[in-house]
């Protein structure tokens, strides 16, 4: 049985990833800032496996440390999904706006990777998947809302740097889920959550003998340009 941690697992893409991994028999830690909501979601979606809600604000060092101790050494999959979306244009952004976006969208994943990548390296196996965006890619000229694009570009850089520290069968990658119908994406988005979650779940569950994918950005199960 795999063990997976999904941040921001109480809604949207994160919720669907939790549901899909549970249906495959995994033990899933559903990370949520609001444990009341998180527990309600966990009860609603757990399937063949087991979903355990854990309190996690990714910007809280105390939460990250406590969770690392609770989970221990045997985490197989880390999905850094929690994120915030600031839609303000560049000319209206404050330093605090950009700081808040980066704290959640990049430094939160950095804290969790710093905790769990060494443990995965010691075991020689593990998958870390950062949920990014086309708005954070240089190939798309970091288009879209400025603070969001800056923070996702930083997350992409973190993915590349962390992948260079991955050993054995440990993989660190980023996924662009596309424009998905969630609270963040809105009702007009063309993709549903199952489409947004598909590549994440695929990376999390690929067999170890399927060829190593490491330090890449993927969309629809294919490597795309940063």
Which positions does each model-derived feature cover?
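Rossmann-fold cofactor-recognition segment
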Residues: 46-62
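C-terminal helical subdomain
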Residues: 167-170, 174-180, 186-226
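Rossmann-fold scaffold of SDR-type NAD(P)-dependent oxidoreductases
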Residues: 7, 75-83, 130, 173
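Conserved glycine-rich Rossmann-like NAD(P)H-binding loop of the short-chain dehydrogenase/reductase
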Residues: 24-40
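Active-site Tyr-X3-Lys motif and surrounding loop/helix of classical short-chain dehydrogenase/reductase
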Residues: 66, 88-92, 96-103
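Catalytic loop of short-chain dehydrogenase/reductase
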Residues: 84, 91-95, 127-167
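Canonical Rossmann dinucleotide-binding motif of NAD(H)/NADP(H)-dependent dehydrogenases/reductases
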Residues: 1-29
